[in-house]
């Protein structure tokens, strides 16, 4: 199993859904049968988390009608606190602008933010706390969490807008190398393996291919897409897009015939075929 994308979300699910003891008991149990029981419960919690997350994202997407906002703020007192960070990250990636997602916790507003970079939003949260705008907050360059009184919502919003107004937050897509599709093969993947493990201080390389035709081959769970990327010479590679707005993507690729495509090179878990995970297209 893939530790980051398969096991990780399940181990985290207990804590996200407010029952962190489940994951602790799973990992510390000396009895494989008891561990299996906890594993089953945790998997159910992860499915519950996914349903809540999908519902909130669909609600937000159906209500967003102004993509010119400098920053996106989303708030609903009924949203589950455990999924705010995931949702903020996905909205940031899809909208290409900082996104802050908030809900109520007792008498306060709590939230999570994700940013493209440019400004350190973790530092901004600490500055806001020092100025008394929020009760507490912190994080790092691209992610933050915060708590504030409801009466401080407008001052907090104005504080962030003022900070971002002169900042370049809509960044150009960064990539390591311009590639022909013919170079996406086992040799490239073997070379990339030498650079691993990837993480915060060693990010996985992103590549770019120009003048690529994109065809949707299949859609999974209404949000994941299998695509065929083809160049002008007929060379092709399979590309995957995850957690995407399928209808918006279909509409976008109908606007023109060729795109610049940004992606990571991967090996398919099931077929062992070399594929790409699409990060963005223009």
What spans do the regions from the language model cover?
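Noncatalytic, beta-rich nucleic-acid-contacting surfaces in large DNA/RNA-processing enzymes
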Residues: 108-112, 214-216, 274-279
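Anionic-ligand-binding alpha/beta catalytic cores of soluble enzymes and soluble regulatory domains
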Residues: 153-208
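Short aromatic-glycine-enriched beta-strand elements
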Residues: 220-227, 272-276
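Beta-strand/loop nucleic-acid-binding surfaces
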Residues: 234-253
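Hydrophobic helix-and-loop "lid/oligomerization" segment in the mid-to-C-terminal part
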Residues: 1-154, 158, 174, 178, ...
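A residue-level signal for conserved active-site and pocket-lining positions in enzyme catalytic cores
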Residues: 12, 192, 263
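OB-fold single-stranded nucleic acid-binding module
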Residues: 144, 152-155, 186, 247-249, ...
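Structural detector for short beta-strands of small beta-barrel domains
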Residues: 201-223, 260-262
